[in-house]
């Protein structure tokens, strides 16, 4: 009897081991990184050209794949309350398909209300289990039908069977750049990313999207949408990413182009680490960047209301004003031949764990 039980247990263990090895092999076979310098087409291309001396509006907004209503927390986020209580997020997917659609439409309406000429959006799901297969890319492109758009995939993962009771699933997601003006060319540039065994399967395929727009007089307006790494202990990968971005910024300035780089920097870009009331300690992932960290001739266009309105909340707990940790990580870098004035928009974190940022600018 004991031998029979032992054989059964051994068989169960062997089956489990085969399952694990098979799953790891599946993840490895499915794993890939998109090539650097990948050219991307503009959908619904526009024809009007950008002009010097004219005022324009640009917006950036991380829509958080439609999951982050105020009552949402994310399983990968951790934190600590001021009293030392450890916190960890709960969910790997949106709360429901209904909530997913409501948040996506809410974010779209918030974007449309700002009447921007150019729009950067991050964490836009195209086909993902975490968002119940709701195609946010299609919804935004249809809702912003008067714009040309380009999509850069920066998250393509095989089915992640974790957490076990609510698997994150497979994901195809990325960044969308919208423009009411003519785009000559789009190039997806690959950021350095971690190749650690587990991290490479779960982290984004980080990139930045470079879009070139003709300007009267022969120069170009170069729009660069970015989404830098957040989960990087020691900041080594983020330092490499910033170095590459600065290399590109410097090259464009040497050519006399107008440059705006914007998006989710996942760094404090407004000296806001301790600006807002909070019942939580400052998270480990919050690093500070300022204009001194940028290539010569560039600056962060700090929002005039950056001390009053944060752009990102911690997602380790549901959002509660003055309790959940908040900081400014979204915004724009501008070259010194651009006059710019930015404003953080108070969206109340109703549809995303981010608030939008809008910037008015003029090419000098």
Regions found by a protein language model. Name each.
Residues 3-142, 153-162, 166-172:
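N-terminal, active-site-proximal structural segment of metallo-dependent hydrolase catalytic domains
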Residues 142-145, 170-186, 213-216, 320-339, ...:
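Conserved beta strand-loop-helix elements of the APE1-like EEP
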Residues 63-66, 124-128, 154-158, 183-184, ...:
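Solvent-exposed loop/turn segments at secondary-structure junctions
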Residues 37, 156-220:
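A well-ordered secondary-structure block
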Residues 90-96, 124-128, 191-200, 227-236:
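Surface-exposed cleft-lining segments at the edges of enzyme active sites
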Residues 57-63, 90-93, 103-133, 178, ...:
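Active-site beta-strand/loop signature of hydrolases that rely on acidic residues for catalysis
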Residues 232-336:
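Metal-dependent phosphoesterases centered on the DNase I-like endonuclease/exonuclease/phosphatase
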Residues 198-200, 318-323, 346-350:
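Short proline/glycine-enriched turn/loop segments at secondary-structure junctions
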């Amino acid at each position: 009897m004991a031998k029979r039980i032992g054989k059964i247990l051994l068989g169960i263990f062997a089956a489990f081991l085969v399952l694990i090895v098979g799953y790891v092999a599946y993840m490895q076979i499915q794993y890939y990184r998109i090539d650097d310098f990948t050219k991307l087409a503009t959908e619904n291309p526009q024809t009007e050209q950008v002009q010097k001396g004219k005022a324009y509006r640009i917006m950036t907004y991380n829509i958080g794949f439609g999951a982050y209503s105020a009552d949402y927390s994310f399983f990968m986020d951790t934190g600590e309350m001021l009293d030392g209580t450890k916190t960890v997020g709960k969910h790997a997917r949106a709360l429901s398909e209904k909530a997913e659609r409501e948040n996506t439409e809410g974010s779209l309406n918030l974007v449309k209300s700002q009447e921007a000429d150019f729009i950067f959006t991050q964490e836009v799901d195209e086909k993902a289990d975490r968002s119940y297969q709701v195609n946010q890319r299609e919804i935004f492109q249809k809702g912003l039908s008067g714009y040309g758009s380009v999509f850069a995939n920066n998250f393509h993962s095989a089915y992640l069977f974790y957490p076990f009771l609510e698997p994150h699933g497979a994901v195809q997601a990325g960044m969308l750049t919208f423009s009411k003006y003519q785009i000559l060319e789009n190039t997806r540039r690959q950021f350095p990313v971690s190749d650690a065994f587990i991290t490479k399967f779960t982290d984004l395929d980080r990139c930045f999207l470079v879009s070139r727009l003709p300007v009267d007089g022969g120069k170009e307006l170069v729009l660069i949408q970015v989404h830098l790494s957040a989960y990087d202990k020691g900041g080594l990968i983020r330092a490499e990413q910033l170095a590459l971005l600065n290399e590109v910024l410097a090259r464009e300035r040497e050519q006399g182009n107008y440059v705006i780089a914007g998006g989710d920097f996942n760094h404090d870009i407004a000296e806001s680490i301790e600006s807002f009331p909070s019942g939580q300690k400052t998270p480990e992932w919050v690093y500070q960047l300022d204009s001194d960290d940028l290539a010569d001739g560039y600056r962060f266009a700090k929002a005039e209301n950056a001390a009053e309105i944060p752009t990102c909340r911690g997602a380790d707990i549901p959002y509660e004003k003055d309790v959940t940790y908040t900081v400014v990580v979204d915004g724009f870098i501008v070259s010194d031949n651009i006059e710019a004035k930015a404003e953080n928009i108070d969206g109340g974190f109703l549809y995303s764990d981010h608030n939008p940022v809008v910037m008015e600018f003029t090419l000098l």
